[in-house]
């Protein structure tokens, strides 16, 4: 249903008519659908969702730096394999579907408010800047509730890794969710 919600947006057809990836980031895993010239090339599920990363890698006594490094290494290894198997060229676009994605966009200073299409380089730069802060400061900056606080670090690292490892020129975060897909259906 998340897919239907983004596919119903006017910009979607134009983006997937190029080389694009639609990435639905969930708690247990992510689903990546690769498009080329308007056609689906593949859809793959990977077990690197935000809750899974937290539960798998967050250990008592582990320093914050070590925790972040473990998440990054784990994600990067998975994405290197994905890239080798399924991507033969740089992507033009990545479309992210996830609740945190819109929080990241809202935290950025965009040239045109409401236009959630941004250069990947700018998006990654913002995530790097954000990740240098303490978790509490990130929560404040993004106006998040504390019930999501444990997932913010895995989310930032995951979004950054996806944007850099899949090497897209631009990122689009339409800010849709499953409820939008239900309404569209």
Task: List PLM regions with ranges.
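Conserved catalytic-loop position in the HRD/HxD motif
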Residues: 24
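Helical "lid/coupling" subdomains associated with nucleotide-phosphate turnover
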Residues: 1-19, 34-36, 42-185
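Active-site-adjacent helix-turn-beta-strand microarchitecture at beta-sheet edges
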Residues: 29
């Amino acid at each position: 249903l998340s897919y239907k919600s983004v596919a119903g947006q006017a910009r979607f057809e134009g983006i997937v008519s190029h080389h694009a990836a639609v990435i639905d980031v969930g708690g247990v895993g992510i689903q990546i659908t690769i498009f080329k010239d308007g056609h689906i090339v593949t859809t793959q599920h990977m077990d690197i969702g935000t809750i899974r990363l937290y539960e798998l890698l967050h250990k008592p006594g582990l320093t914050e730096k070590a925790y972040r490094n473990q998440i990054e290494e784990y994600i990067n290894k998975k994405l290197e394999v994905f890239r080798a198997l399924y991507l033969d060229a740089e992507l033009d676009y990545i479309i992210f579907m996830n609740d945190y994605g819109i929080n990241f966009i809202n935290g950025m200073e965009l040239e045109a408010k409401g236009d959630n299409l941004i250069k990947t380089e700018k998006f990654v730069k913002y995530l790097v800047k954000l990740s240098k802060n303490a978790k509490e400061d990130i929560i404040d900056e993004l106006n998040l509730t504390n019930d999501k606080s444990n997932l913010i670090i895995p989310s930032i690292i995951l979004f950054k890794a996806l944007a850099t490892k899949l090497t897209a020129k631009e990122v689009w975060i339409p800010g849709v969710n499953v409820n939008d897909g239900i309404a569209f259906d």
